[in-house]
Amino acid sequence: QVLAKENPQHTYYFTDVQELDICDKQAVWTYMAEKQIELVVNCAAYTAVDKAEDNQELAYKLNCEAPKQLASAAQANGAAMIQVSTDYVFDGTAHIPYTEDCDPCPDSVYGTTKLEGEKEVMNHCEQAVVIRTAWLYSTFGNNFVKTMIRLGKERDSLGVVFDQIGTPTYANDLARAIYAIINKGIVRGIYHFSNEGVCSWYDFTVAIHRL
């Protein structure tokens, strides 16, 4: 929503599952045709990494089938599509940063379904961009920062892993990066974006409660 505030010259449609079920092919195609959509930015996903192992069908439906429907509808309407993806398309064992040229190697249902979703988007829409990000947080929705703030108020102590390293990324910064891609003209391909610096989930939690 930061894009709408900073770039009000465009018309934006923000949808949730009540307004548009992106798993419903007919609903997607009808909506895009009626609204004359020129660009789709898909931020929707099944993001419960652990639960995805037991809910593989739902994860596949939301992370793979839904992006395919969006991409197909975008292509039919002459629209571009940006698919927001994840660092989980890699297994996290590398000791150097992952670049766009690195071969994906997911080791979870979540990562696998997100990778398949990337492929579907690239296969079904000529003007397609995949942007991978990591450890996303925002004032909207559920995310690690909001969870830690809530748990910090409810509990005297918290147990947080310290051996997983990543880069927390502010959703507003990701939105601005997406707009930069749009503003310069959609160049088909895969992009990586995150904020700077690295930390563990433990370090991140400590920083959250210092603020």
Language model region names:
Residues 40, 54-82:
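NAD(P)-cofactor binding segment of oxidoreductase domains
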Residues 1, 177, 184-211:
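Mid/C-terminal beta-alpha module of Rossmann-like enzyme folds, strongest
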Residues 119-166, 171-173, 179-180:
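NAD(P)-dependent short-chain dehydrogenase/reductase
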Residues 15, 40-44, 81-86, 91, ...:
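SDR active-site strand-loop-helix element
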Residues 1-39:
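N-terminal Rossmann/SDR dinucleotide-binding element
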Residues 25-62:
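NAD(P)H-binding glycine-rich loop region in Rossmannoid oxidoreductase-like domains
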Residues 61, 65-69, 89-131, 135-136:
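Catalytic helix-loop patch of NAD(P)-dependent Rossmann-fold dehydrogenases
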Residues 50-57, 92-96, 141-142:
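Conserved catalytic-core motifs of eukaryotic protein kinase domains, centered on the activation segment
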